[in-house]
Amino acid sequence: EISECLVGSEMCIRDSYHYMIDLTGGPCIYKRISGCGSGTEYMAVTPWGDLYPCHQFVGDPKYLMGDIWKGVTNTAVRDEFKHCNAYARPECKDCWAKLYCSGGCAANAFHATGSIRGVYEAGCELFRKRIECAIMMKVAEDSAKANG
């Protein structure tokens, strides 16, 4: 079991930083819902000045948002990304991990399903496992502190 490895081995813990999720703090609720902010809060800028919602969409003409001279001219792409969040995906509605993954990565969803609003199932399963392991590690850490 992954969590047993993580709890039982300092070396394994150092090598598994992706399981180190801040369960008690973390981002504000807005970021927990909206995720990374691709296409709305930040954009990828190419060496030629083109603007894309994320580096993973660079070169795809469908996702070209504009350029650094004219700004965002393709507002439809921005609006599409604005609605990419934990509550916009019906599949996320009842998921216990939605406020940790924020609905997942739009680029991963696009590559898996052809839509930025799709759901990358393998990514969901991996993220839920990360959260489970983080919870297990937190419980073990708190237990070790309590037991001296």
Regions found by a protein language model. Give the residues of each.
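Short, acidic, Ser/Thr-enriched surface-loop or helix-capping motifs
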Residues: 46
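Flexible glycine/acidic-rich beta-alpha junction loops that bind and position SAM and/or redox cofactors
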Residues: 14-26, 56-62
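Flexible mid-to-C-terminal extensions adjoining Fe-S/redox cofactors in radical SAM and related proteins
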Residues: 51, 58-148
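Single conserved hydrophobic/aromatic residue that forms the stacking wall/gate
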Residues: 1-13
